[in-house]
Regions:
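Glycine-rich, low-complexity intrinsically disordered segments
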Residues: 1-192
Length: 192
């Protein structure tokens, strides 16, 4: 361990593995239900390019305060997962927007309030991959530093797309927030 006198910019540089993970080097894949009647190949090809923003998920452990003689013993409670949100660039064929709306509508129809009741049918999976800057040759596949696999996702919210006469030099985008059962963290060599 470095002593206080050894903590300098050169030592910091040597500790920053890979030059630091970059927030703009990521890729998202989302599996859509086959029952939607849409071209899954077209959507799967576009998602990694048009998902503009995502997040590495949060998870939380609840807290159970147990009082004892004027003190409180904090005991770990149950795990919960925050919803996962992605931001999607909208192109003129609306293919991803259409798929998200159909997926949401298949769960609870806009007009009839009926829909698919079996989670096995409407819940799917997704991945967010943190990519490395490292590459030896142009065209080499990206190196994955870490991957998060979401199980049991479904769209909870498909956001609005603001329209505005004054909006110049902009491409439409929208957000989708997913609920999910859990996620797994995967390294390039297997589970952590």
């Amino acid at each position: 361990m470095a002593t206080f006198n050894q903590r300098n910019i050169t030592e910091f540089r040597s500790r920053l593995a890979g030059g630091g993970a970059r927030a703009n080097l990521f890729e998202v894949e989302i599996a859509f239900p086959e029952e939607l009647g849409i071209n899954l190949t077209d959507i799967s090809d576009k998602v990694p390019f048009l998902v503009k923003a995502a997040e590495i998920p949060a998870s939380n452990l609840g807290n159970i305060p147990v009082p004892y003689r004027g003190r409180v013993l904090p005991v770990a409670g149950d795990r919960t997962f925050d919803p996962w949100t992605v931001t999607i660039i909208n192109d003129t064929d609306f293919i991803i927007r259409d798929a998200m709306e159909k997926w949401s509508n298949s769960i609870n129809d806009l007009q009839t309030a009926q829909g698919t009741i079996s989670p096995e049918v409407y819940q799917r999976s997704a991945q967010v991959k943190q990519l490395s800057r490292e590459g030896t040759n142009p065209g080499d596949p990206e190196k994955v530093l870490r991957m998060y696999n979401f199980e049991g996702i479904y769209p909870n919210t498909v956001s609005n797309i603001p329209l505005d006469f004054g909006a110049t030099d902009q491409i439409e985008e929208f957000q989708v927030t997913f609920n999910y059962l859990f996620y797994e963290v995967v390294s390039p060599t297997g589970n952590f």
